[in-house]
């Protein structure tokens, strides 16, 4: 995205709209999301699944230190695409919201309220001088009173519920795959396989998913708990692709 001298003032100031109604710094934040590792969220009638690829930014990096699916509370988890530091800050904020809600009300926070709270923070950073937008999109999923919930929050502060959603580098290819193959009546195993197939569709021809290059989190209405999958379980599902 390039702009001439006439657009420079709108380009640099986050609080000023351009003549065509754009906030360029927010647009740039969306570009940061598109450069992130692909993450996918899928909701069925009985489960939710988040799958995200993870790669080494440096060859000597310990792959076990890379985390792309995060627990927010017992019943909800998330992943992100974009700037990792921005994602970490928002995930910590979401965890604090969930913890405070349990301490005050002695019950799990609703996923709708949790998502709105995170989105409100992101929106605030689009309208004040001296700050920049969060360059990250979050996929938030879990079980809320026996009902599967799936949301995606954008850098602008917009958030929407989804049946299935993809963010990051491979979002376009993954979204096309999900539009063709998504079914609402999938069980948890079928939902996990669909997420892995959608993620595989975004890879180059000579690449394939391994237990070390993908993270999976899931929850079912049967237990209501959001769990992260072990390497042994990931390998079992990857062999079925």
UniProtKB/Swiss-Prot annotation:
Keyword terms of this UniProt record: Cytoplasm, Proteasome
Subcellular location per the Swiss-Prot or TrEMBL entry: Cytoplasm
Cellular component, GO annotation: cytoplasm; proteasome core complex, alpha-subunit complex
Regulation: The formation of the proteasomal ATPase PAN-20S proteasome complex, via the docking of the C-termini of PAN into the intersubunit pockets in the alpha-rings, triggers opening of the gate for substrate entry. Interconversion between the open-gate and close-gate conformations leads to a dynamic regulation of the 20S proteasome proteolysis activity.
GO biological process entries: proteasome-mediated ubiquitin-dependent protein catabolic process
Classification via PROSITE patterns: PROTEASOME_ALPHA_1, PROTEASOME_ALPHA_2
InterPro entries referenced in this protein's UniProt entry, alphabetically: Ntn_hydrolases_N (IPR029055), Proteasome_alpha (IPR050115), Proteasome_alpha-type (IPR023332), Proteasome_asu_arc (IPR019982), Proteasome_asu_N (IPR000426), Proteasome_sua/b (IPR001353)
Highest taxon, organism lineage: Archaea
GO function term, MF aspect, one: threonine-type endopeptidase activity
NCBIfam families: arc_protsome_A, PRK03996.1
Its biological purpose: Component of the proteasome core, a large protease complex with broad specificity involved in protein degradation.
Annotated PANTHER family: PROTEASOME SUBUNIT ALPHA/BETA (PTHR11599)
Quaternary structure (record): The 20S proteasome core is composed of 14 alpha and 14 beta subunits that assemble into four stacked heptameric rings, resulting in a barrel-shaped structure. The two inner rings, each composed of seven catalytic beta subunits, are sandwiched by two outer rings, each composed of seven alpha subunits. The catalytic chamber with the active sites is on the inside of the barrel. Has a gated structure, the ends of the cylinder being occluded by the N-termini of the alpha-subunits. Is capped at one or both ends by the proteasome regulatory ATPase, PAN.
Protein family according to the UniProt entry: Belongs to the peptidase T1A family.
Protein name: Proteasome subunit alpha
Gene: psmA
């Amino acid at each position: 995205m390039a702009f001439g001298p006439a657009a420079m003032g709108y380009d640099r100031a986050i609080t000023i709209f351009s003549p065509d109604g754009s906030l360029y710094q927010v647009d740039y934040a969306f570009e940061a999301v598109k450069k992130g590792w692909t993450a996918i969220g899928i909701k069925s009638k009985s489960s939710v699944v988040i799958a995200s690829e993870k790669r080494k930014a440096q060859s000597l990096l310990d792959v076990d230190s890379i985390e792309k699916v995060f627990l927010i509370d017992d019943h909800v988890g998330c992943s992100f695409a974009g700037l990792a530091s921005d994602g970490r800050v928002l995930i910590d904020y979401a965890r604090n919201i969930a913890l405070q809600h349990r301490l005050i009300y002695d019950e799990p926070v609703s996923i709708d309220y949790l998502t709105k709270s995170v989105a409100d923070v992101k929106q605030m950073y689009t309208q004040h001088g001296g700050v920049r937008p969060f360059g990250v999109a979050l996929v938030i999923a879990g079980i809320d009173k026996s009902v599967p919930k799936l949301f995606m929050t954008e850098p602008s502060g917009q958030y929407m519920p989804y049946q299935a959603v993809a963010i990051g580098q491979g979002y376009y290819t993954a979204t096309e795959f999900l539009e063709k193959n998504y079914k609402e009546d999938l069980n948890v195993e079928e939902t996990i396989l669909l997420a892995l197939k959608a993620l595989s569709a975004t890879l180059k021809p000579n690449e394939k998913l391994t237990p070390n290059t993908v993270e999976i989190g899931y929850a079912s209405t049967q237990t209501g708990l959001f769990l992260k999958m072990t390497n042994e379980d990931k390998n079992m599902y990857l062999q079925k692709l």
